């Protein structure tokens, strides 16, 4: 499994790029959004990748973030959504937009992707709505982008640190923080997100981050 490619951008096509990794060129299919973010040929680039295997075809699909890759993988679990349709949805909405549309049951936004009809858009929302909050939590903790590494340098040994005596935050604080981070990543104002998460946490103090996100989204829906 090829999970990440880092090298020099050699060529940009209409729906793919060619990345030179120490003399070996890899064709990586990307969304319109990812293609627009690519640097000029000759510059360093890195993409998280998913290898899609068919009976007579092997294709690499590339993503600038790990959360985008995970959303693509999840979209392909829906009947009627292949690798290219998943890329079209991500290209039209981005990972945050997909998470928002699915969480709010907004099939019309999913349908805005080229080649995605109303039946498939509705199926995406219905089948993935319960899974969206978990990926949203991951999005709040995942690194922003894949870093291009052309040459590796040896690392110096890290200095020893004294054991921390600071107490770890309680689990509830971690859950509310993760939920707040996920909602702000979706574009909600921090004050609105904090108020919704606080209310959701008060209604269900034992809720984990995914449950808090689901409850907060219901509270925020009338404002969007």
From Swiss-Prot:
- Which parts pass through the membrane? none
Q: Where in the cell is it found?
A: Cytoplasm
A single Pfam family, by name? HHH_5
Q: Cite the GO molecular-function annotations of the record.
A: ATP binding; four-way junction DNA binding; four-way junction helicase activity
Which residue ranges are recorded for the region named Disordered?
150-181
Ranges for the region named Domain II are: 65-143
Q: Name the Gene Ontology biological process terms.
A: DNA recombination; DNA repair
Q: How does it assemble?
A: Homotetramer. Forms an RuvA(8)-RuvB(12)-Holliday junction (HJ) complex. HJ DNA is sandwiched between 2 RuvA tetramers; dsDNA enters through RuvA and exits via RuvB. An RuvB hexamer assembles on each DNA strand where it exits the tetramer. Each RuvB hexamer is contacted by two RuvA subunits (via domain III) on 2 adjacent RuvB subunits; this complex drives branch migration. In the full resolvosome a probable DNA-RuvA(4)-RuvB(12)-RuvC(2) complex forms which resolves the HJ.
Query: What protein does this entry describe?
Result: Holliday junction branch migration complex subunit RuvA
What is the organism of origin for this protein?
Cereibacter sphaeroides (strain ATCC 17025 / ATH 2.4.3)
Q: What is the lineage of its organism?
A: Bacteria, Pseudomonadati, Pseudomonadota, Alphaproteobacteria, Rhodobacterales
């Amino acid at each position: 499994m090829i999970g990440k490619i880092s090298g020099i951008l050699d060529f940009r096509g209409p729906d793919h790029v060619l990345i030179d990794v120490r003399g070996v060129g890899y064709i990586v299919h990307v969304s319109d959004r990812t293609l627009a973010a690519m640097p000029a040929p000759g510059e360093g680039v890195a993409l998280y990748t998913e290898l899609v295997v068919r009976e007579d075809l092997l294709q690499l699909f590339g993503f600038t973030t790990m959360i985008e890759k995970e959303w693509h993988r999840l979209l392909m679990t829906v009947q009627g959504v292949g690798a290219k349709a998943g890329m079209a949805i991500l290209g039209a909405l981005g990972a945050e937009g997909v998470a928002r549309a699915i969480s709010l049951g907004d099939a019309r936004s999913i349908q805005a992707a080229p080649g995605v009809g109303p039946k498939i858009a509705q199926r995406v929302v219905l089948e993935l709505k319960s899974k969206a909050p978990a990926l949203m939590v991951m999005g709040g903790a995942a690194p922003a982008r894949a870093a291009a590494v052309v040459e590796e340098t040896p690392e110096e040994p890290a200095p020893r640190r004294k054991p921390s005596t600071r107490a770890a935050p309680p689990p509830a604080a971690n859950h509310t923080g993760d939920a707040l981070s996920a909602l702000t990543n979706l574009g909600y104002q921090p004050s609105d997100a904090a108020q919704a998460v606080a209310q959701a946490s008060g209604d269900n103090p034992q809720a984990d981050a995914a449950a808090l996100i689901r409850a907060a989204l219901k509270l925020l829906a009338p404002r969007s």
